[in-house]
């Protein structure tokens, strides 16, 4: 089998509600869709992030991909191992989109789901968390009023999706964030595990001041309160709860450094930010060897990427925390199979060959036109 064409499409898909965090507010998701065609008539699909810059890198690499056997995934990754060195995160994103499409091709060629190719199923359904964040209707609220409103949102999510874990998107105001967490705990009477993710917007001093209150709650983990492994290690010395990160462990040599410092307990993996499914599995093996835990980060994936994360979680034993997903916030998608319907706190792993999902051509064209008109979302 040989690659004959590499097509790249950038899409904008609106969110059903503006999504706010300490980083800012988004109303649209921009994603990059990769389609790899072969001389045997099979097509593999992939998805990644960073829109047009990522698409440009993939298009630049495409001439070197034509004629390559897409089933030799490890060789392909080695061929382009310097891409992240020159392009950073966007380079990882480009490789991830290409590699994901190759895994999809391998599954279709062998008529096997991706999870089987990764070693088989550890689990058939993946526990997911639900996201609580400040919405437009909360504008002007603060203090206990905002905390009560967010607690109401969290309770509604638990009742509708039956999730066992809630994640609060934090802010630059740790006092308000912890007040919100306490309101969630009270509303749910400790029946649901909680996470808070300020995206490193807190200071070390603020975090240390908030720890005694957070430690009274049913915490799943505290995610990226501060930036950098040294700062996280300082927090970890005082924290009687797991610390998680996707912002301070971003490349392979960060993992042993985090281990030596005792900085974190849970590494949040992301196939797009680690350069593909194979590198993510290598990360899992490293974490397991070092005694670290692991879960899956969410960065506004659509259905193709969500399917990839579900398969990775299905085949990776060490992933022992509920997976984050923002697919439930999307107004639409670009695949035929609806993956966003969380029931019983879980998402099923797609069962077809490869990723187990198919592109809806009409939706792809529609959302590509939105990107052509508006450009990449911020």
Question: Where are the model-predicted features located?
Answer:
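Conserved, mostly hydrophobic/aromatic
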Residues: 3, 34, 41, 61, ...
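Metal- or metallocofactor-binding catalytic centers and their adjacent structured scaffolds
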Residues: 36-110
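Hydrophobic faces of well-ordered beta-strands that scaffold small-molecule active sites
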Residues: 44, 126-130, 164-168, 194-198, ...
């Amino acid at each position: 089998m040989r690659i004959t064409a590499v097509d790249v499409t950038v899409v904008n898909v609106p969110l059903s509600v503006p999504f706010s965090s300490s980083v800012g507010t988004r109303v649209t998701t921009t994603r990059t869709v990769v389609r790899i065609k072969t001389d045997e008539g099979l097509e593999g699909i992939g998805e990644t992030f960073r829109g047009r810059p990522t698409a440009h890198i993939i298009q630049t690499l495409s001439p070197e991909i034509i004629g390559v056997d897409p089933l030799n995934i490890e060789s392909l990754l080695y061929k382009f191992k310097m891409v992240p060195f020159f392009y950073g995160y966007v380079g990882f994103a480009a490789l991830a989109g290409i590699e994901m499409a190759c895994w999809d091709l391998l599954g279709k060629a062998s008529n096997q789901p991706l999870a089987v190719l990764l070693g088989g199923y550890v689990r058939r359904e993946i526990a997911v968390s639900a996201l609580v964040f400040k919405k437009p209707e909360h504008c002007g609220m603060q203090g206990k009023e905002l905390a009560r409103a967010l607690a109401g949102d969290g309770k509604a999510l638990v009742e509708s999706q039956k999730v066992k874990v809630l994640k609060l998107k934090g802010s630059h105001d740790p006092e308000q964030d912890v007040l919100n967490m306490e309101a969630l705990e009270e509303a749910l009477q400790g029946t649901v595990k909680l996470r808070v993710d300020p995206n490193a917007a807190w200071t070390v001093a603020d975090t240390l001041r908030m720890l005694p209150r957070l430690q009274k709650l049913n915490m799943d983990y505290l995610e990226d309160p501060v930036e950098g492994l040294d700062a996280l290690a300082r927090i970890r010395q005082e924290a009687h709860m797991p610390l998680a990160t996707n912002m301070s462990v971003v490349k392979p040599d960060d993992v042993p450094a985090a281990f030596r410092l005792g900085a974190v307990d849970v590494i949040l993996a992301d196939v797009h930010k680690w350069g593909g499914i194979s590198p993510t599995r290598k990360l899992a093996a490293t974490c397991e060897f070092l005694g670290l835990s692991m879960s899956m980060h969410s960065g506004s994936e659509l259905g193709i990427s969500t399917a990839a994360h579900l398969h990775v979680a299905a085949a990776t034993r060490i992933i022992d925390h509920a997976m984050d997903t923002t697919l439930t916030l999307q107004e639409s998608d670009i695949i035929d199979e609806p993956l966003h319907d969380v029931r019983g706190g879980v998402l099923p792993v797609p069962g077809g060959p490869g990723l187990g999902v198919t592109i809806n051509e009409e939706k792809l064209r529609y959302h590509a036109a939105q990107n052509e008109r508006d450009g990449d979302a911020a």
